[in-house]
């Protein structure tokens, strides 16, 4: 058993195909089959079921798959950590964040990071916070930014950002002449909600007492779309203050306070406690922590 065989096995399991796995590892289908046979002989067990239309893991194969992924990650980590003993910060970093964080909070930080460490390659995994947490915990993502709070004894968490959520209306909306409204007034407006995610959960809870009269006019998949539709006066919404700076400056929308309502979105930087991170990942963590609270809001921790 060697790393090449394990790599081939992992690709076959993921792609459910010998031929497609062969393309990934630059081997013929017969060579891939030979490597799998050698693994099955070494473990004295059938690892893959080839009888179905696609290749499936057997129970023994599922056990080996988990170990194979861990072994390959440990190999990559060890190679990187040995390389890190030199003076140059280099190598890959896999970073996880949701779309809004990638669009509105990270570009300036990542641009500065690339200027400082041009030999580091950053790969971004974009998804919801719970998916990012899963990837950080299984080791396939080095560092992530997720919505707080969270409870995980396996993760180190640094609070880095706190942003107030405000009520957003078009500059054409009559409410734009005001600085503050009541929640009852908001409930009477055509609401635009995000389809899923943290903000949707917060808004569903906020408007629960007004359920009988709330009119959710639209559910949209991204913050960018919500801003455009609110700007066109197709409805109203709530948004993190920093995500609408450009639209407020351009006069397209106005952000209002809601009497008696204080909503915040908090973000944390997360990585595994038990993992030795490469210097490139450590450098990125350090830079992000230097830039914490760019919104100017107080740090509660």
Name the predicted role of every residue range:
Residues 11-28:
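Short helix-boundary/capping micro-motifs
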Residues 18, 40-59:
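A short LG(V/I)-centered, amphipathic sequence patch enriched
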Residues 88-153, 211, 220:
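Central regulatory/effector-binding core of bacterial HTH transcription factors
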Residues 105, 171, 254-298:
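A late-sequence structural motif
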Residues 128-141, 146-147, 198-255:
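Hydrophobic hinge/microswitch elements
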Residues 152-191:
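Flexible hinge/capping segments at coil-to-helix
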């Amino acid at each position: 058993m060697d790393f090449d065989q394990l790599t081939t096995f992992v690709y076959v399991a993921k792609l459910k195909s010998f031929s497609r796995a062969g393309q990934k590892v630059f081997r013929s289908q017969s060579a891939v089959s030979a490597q799998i046979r050698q693994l099955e002989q070494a473990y004295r067990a059938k690892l893959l079921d080839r009888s179905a239309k696609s290749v499936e893991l057997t129970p023994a194969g599922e056990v080996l798959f988990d170990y194979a992924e861990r072994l390959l990650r440990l190999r990559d980590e060890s190679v990187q950590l040995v390389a890190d003993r030199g003076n140059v910060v280099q190598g890959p970093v896999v970073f996880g964040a949701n779309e809004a964080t990638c669009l509105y909070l990270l570009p300036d930080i990542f641009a500065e990071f690339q200027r400082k460490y041009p030999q580091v390659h950053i790969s971004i995994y974009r998804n919801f916070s719970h998916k990012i947490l899963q990837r950080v915990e299984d080791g396939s993502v080095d560092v992530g930014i997720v919505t707080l709070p969270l409870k995980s004894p396996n993760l180190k968490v640094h609070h880095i950002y706190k942003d107030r959520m405000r009520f957003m209306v078009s500059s054409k909306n009559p409410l734009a002449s005001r600085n503050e409204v009541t929640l009852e007034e908001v409930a009477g407006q055509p609401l635009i909600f995000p389809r899923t995610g943290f903000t949707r959960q917060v808004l569903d809870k906020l408007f629960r007492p007004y359920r009988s009269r709330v009119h959710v006019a639209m559910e949209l998949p991204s913050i960018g779309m919500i801003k455009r539709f609110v700007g066109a006066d197709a409805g109203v919404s709530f948004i993190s203050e920093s995500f609408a700076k450009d639209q407020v400056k351009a006069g397209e929308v106005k952000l209002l306070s809601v009497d008696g309502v204080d909503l915040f979105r908090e973000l944390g930087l997360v990585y595994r406690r038990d993992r030795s991170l490469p210097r490139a990942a450590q450098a990125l963590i350090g830079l992000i922590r230097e830039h914490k609270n760019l919104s100017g809001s107080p740090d509660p921790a």
